[in-house]
């Protein structure tokens, strides 16, 4: 049995366990908490749809990853995060303490590592069809021939049928034609320090590049409020602290992985 097959078997077994849990709510759209963004989206980010998240530049990869994690929290349910093994070798593991810091529950996060982009897409098609999954994050790096319009349509149709939110996280990649409901560009931004000069809330520059069926787009600077698990506008302040594009290594959080 090859690595891809054994990983998929383990992944399907653990996803099946997710499906036995309480189902995700039936709301079609979930508010982000940021009024202007929710207005542009017609009420919020849609479940049962494919959404693309692009790191605007290579140095914005951490911010784009954080945004995907935060959207997963807003959308609710168990999260299956699929990555290429080369992403781990090239950029390291997901920063467990950082995910916990923004509010991700490690017990509701399942990581799947696949040997190549095609394997990631095959696994994603299976995961997105599982109605018991809340969110599938499909992380792919570089421009890829296998991720064409047809491949994105498969993911979009699977999401529509199951109600799972599929977040296609693209690092060091150029946007191309796709069946995604929304497409976002994420840029790193400075955060406002909290009282006593404590580190501020994560802050991003978000740009809605396109939205299927709606002409609205826009660009906003937003903060993530972990306590309320919502996006808000930054509180004006005279001082800012820079948010590093990449965090230093830290002790790993025990995140579940398939395989």
For every predicted segment, state its role.
Residues 33, 64, 91, 120, ...:
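Helical mechanochemical/support elements of P-loop NTPase systems and associated helical scaffolds
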Residues 77-134, 139:
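Conserved inter-motif catalytic segment of the P-loop NTP-binding fold
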Residues 1-81, 92, 98-107, 214, ...:
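Detector for small/aliphatic-rich hydrophobic stretches
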Residues 37, 53, 109, 136, ...:
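Conserved RecA-like P-loop NTPase ATPase core
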Residues 51, 80-82, 110-112, 167, ...:
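Hydrophobic/aromatic beta-strand patches that form the interior of the parallel beta-sheet core
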Residues 113-190:
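P-loop NTPase motor core
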Residues 168-239, 247-248:
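Phosphate-binding/switch region of NTP-binding enzymes
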Residues 58, 86, 173:
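Short, glycine/serine-rich, charged loops/turns that create anion-binding
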């Amino acid at each position: 049995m090859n690595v891809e097959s054994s990983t998929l078997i383990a992944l399907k077994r653990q996803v099946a366990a997710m499906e036995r849990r309480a189902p995700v709510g039936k709301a079609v759209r979930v508010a982000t908490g940021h009024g202007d963004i929710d207005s542009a989206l017609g009420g919020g980010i849609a479940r049962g749809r494919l959404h693309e998240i692009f790191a605007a530049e290579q140095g914005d990869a951490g911010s784009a990853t954080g945004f995907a994690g935060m959207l997963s929290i807003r959308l609710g349910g168990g999260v299956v995060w699929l990555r290429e093994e080369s992403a781990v070798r090239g950029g390291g593991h997901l920063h467990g303490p950082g995910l916990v810091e923004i509010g991700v529950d490690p017990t509701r996060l399942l990581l799947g590592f696949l040997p190549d982009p095609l394997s990631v897409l095959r696994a994603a098609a299976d995961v997105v069809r599982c109605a018991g999954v809340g969110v599938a994050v499909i992380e792919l790096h570089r421009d890829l021939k296998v991720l064409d319009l047809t491949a994105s349509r498969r993911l979009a149709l699977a999401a529509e049928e199951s109600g799972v939110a599929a977040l296609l996280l693209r690092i060091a990649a150029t946007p191309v034609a796709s069946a995604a409901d929304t497409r976002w560009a994420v840029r790193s931004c400075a955060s406002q320090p909290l009282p006593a000069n404590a580190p501020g809330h994560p802050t991003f520059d978000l740009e809605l590049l396109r939205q299927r069926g709606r002409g609205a787009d826009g660009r906003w600077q937003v903060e993530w409020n972990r306590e309320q698990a919502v996006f808000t506008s930054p509180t004006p302040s005279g001082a800012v602290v820079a948010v590093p594009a990449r965090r230093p290594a830290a002790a790993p959080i025990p995140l579940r992985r398939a395989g």
